[in-house]
Structure formats: C-alpha cells, structure tokens
Amino acid sequence: MNYEDDNVESGQAGKSDAEYKADIANREKEVTKALNAGKPQDALNVALADPPIYTKTGAIKDQNATIVLNLLGSFKDKDVETSVETLNDDQLDILMKYVYRGLATGENSPIFFKWHECVLKKGGAGTIIRVISEKKTV
C-alpha cells in the first residue's frame, strides 16, 4: 500500500490526492471561465461534478468546498430556483451537501437557505434523508 492509498476511504477505488488537486484546479478555472462568460448554470454544473468525496484529506475537501460555496453565494436570489430546476437527482444531493456545509459556516446564511428551499422543493424530503444519512462528505 502506498501513501496515496492511505488517503482514500476504504472500499473505494478513488483518485489520489494529487489527482484531486489537479481536478480542483481545473474546476476552479472552468467555474471562473463560465462565470466570466455570464453562464452561471454552466459554472454550477462544473462545480458539482465529481466532488472529492472519497478522500480523507480535509484540505482537499475544503479547497473544493470554497469554490462551490463562493459560486453559490454569487448567484442572484432570483436565479437560484431556475438553476436548481435544471439539476438531476445526483446533482441535487451533492448541492444539498454543500448547502449544509455552507450553513455550518454561519456566513451568508440567507443565500444558503434560499438554495435549501429550492433543492427541497425540487428533490423532496428524500434529498435531505439521503444527504444526512450518507457517510461520504464534501
């Protein structure tokens, strides 16, 4: 077993931390590019794709969460529901994990409550149940 295997949750053939770091750097560039092009929905899709749920390295999860939470905070209130409506169930679950993470910071709570309301409206209580019972965190 090598060092990289030690940082992957057991039972999962996840990526190495180096691969996650490269993915996160690319994700940040793509999110910024989409936002600069006036395409927040594209930025959201990129931000929610392939989160680092299989790593045990908190710094990697924190770095990715910063990208997602900053993106969520940048949405205009009126655009949140429209954006949520385009997401599939897996994306809704991932988004809800980030919403709870954002609420846990105690910062920018009104926008995270708006996201929560819209995700709950579309995904129903099942989204909340899956998120709170899931062991893999973002």
Curated annotation (Swiss-Prot):
Keywords: Actin-binding, Cell projection, Cytoplasm, Cytoskeleton. Its main location: cytoplasm. It holds the Pfam family P16-Arc. Residues 1-21 are annotated as: Disordered. GO terms for cellular component: Arp2/3 protein complex; cell cortex; cytoplasm; cytosol; pseudopodium. One of its GO terms (biological process) is regulation of actin filament polymerization. InterPro entries: ARPC5, ARPC5_sf. The keyword Cytoplasm applies. GO terms for molecular function: actin filament binding. It is found in: Cytoplasm, Cytoskeleton; Cytoplasm, Cytosol; Cytoplasm, Cell cortex; Cell projection, Pseudopodium. Signal peptide: none annotated. Functions as a component of the Arp2/3 complex which is involved in regulation of actin polymerization and together with an activating nucleation-promoting factor (NPF) mediates the formation of branched actin networks. Seems to contact the pointed end of the daughter actin filament. The Arp2/3 complex is involved in organizing the actin system in cell motility and chemotaxis, in phagocytosis and macropinocytosis, at late steps of endosome processing, and in mitosis. Belongs to the ARPC5 family. Component of the Arp2/3 complex composed of arpB/Arp2, arpC/Arp3, arcA/p41-arc, arcB/p34-arc, arcC/p21-arc, arcD/p20-arc and arcE/p16-arc. Interacts with carmil (via the region between the LRR domain and COOH-terminal proline-rich domain); carmil is required for Arp2/3-dependent actin nucleation. Arp2/3 complex, MyoB, MyoC, and the alpha and beta subunits of capping protein all form a larger complex with carmil. This is Actin-related protein 2/3 complex subunit 5. It comes from Dictyostelium discoideum. The lineage of its organism: Eukaryota, Amoebozoa, Evosea, Eumycetozoa, Dictyostelia. The gene is arcE.
